[in-house]
Amino acid sequence: MKIGIIGAMEPEVAHLVESMENPSSTTIAGIEFVAGQLAGKDVVVTRSGIGKVTASIATTLLIEKYAPDAIINTGSAGGFADELAIGDIVISSEVRHHDVDVTAFGYEIGQMAQQPAAFIPDTALVTAAQKAVASLGEVKAIEGLICTGDSFICDPVRTKTMLEHFPTMAACEMEGAAIAQVCHQFDVPFVVIRSLSDNANNDSPVDFDEYLVKAGHHSALMVIALLEQL
């Protein structure tokens, strides 16, 4: 089994790459892909860059060049679930775009034309992630809706609007739904696993800078624990 692992920023993939055996690096279109072994599995780890376009490019290249059996998106996110604190983890139950609106043509808010309203992660990957939680000690993890858009959310007015549209949203970030959409197009199983770096409020920019490394490390540990369950 070969697993593709995608993170947007260096702190989100650094621990994974450092933990790999027999790493081999290839760069395509400015995106580095590191192949090797991690937790006894063949893996390819890539840092996609921030946002939906770069995430889509990286995912497509990963699938076309390496043909992974499944893809895990790891990294940080802003939290919306009251029971979660910075450093806690959200495992995707579904993934949606929060910044898409073609409702004029009868689609749901967040649904891209000719695409499903929500992208559903692979059941086996979600189950493996749930089992992996036990190995993380004090870190809390829940399963929930993760939403994606090309904006860093720290405006209370925008947060309120997003929660009106997606009242069950547990976390938001900037790559997951794009990765999920590409996986849907290629019929590749996926799961999104995010650790909270901030709480999507006025303090988010400060919290993000301070806690990104912590969130990235927690999410990476979760990915390694998940791989051990596969």
Curated annotation (Swiss-Prot):
GO terms for cellular component: cytosol. This is 5'-methylthioadenosine/S-adenosylhomocysteine nucleosidase. Pfam families: PNP_UDP_1 (PF01048). The lineage of its organism: Bacteria, Pseudomonadati, Pseudomonadota, Gammaproteobacteria, Alteromonadales. The active site is at E12 (proton acceptor), D198 (proton donor). Pathway: Amino-acid biosynthesis; L-methionine biosynthesis via salvage pathway; S-methyl-5-thio-alpha-D-ribose 1-phosphate from S-methyl-5'-thioadenosine (hydrolase route): step 1/2. One of its GO terms (biological process) is nucleoside catabolic process. CDD domains: MTAN (cd09008). The gene is mtnN. SUPFAM superfamilies: Purine and uridine phosphorylases (SSF53167). Catalyzes the irreversible cleavage of the glycosidic bond in both 5'-methylthioadenosine (MTA) and S-adenosylhomocysteine (SAH/AdoHcy) to adenine and the corresponding thioribose, 5'-methylthioribose and S-ribosylhomocysteine, respectively. Also cleaves 5'-deoxyadenosine, a toxic by-product of radical S-adenosylmethionine (SAM) enzymes, into 5-deoxyribose and adenine. Substrate binds at G78, I153, M174, E175.
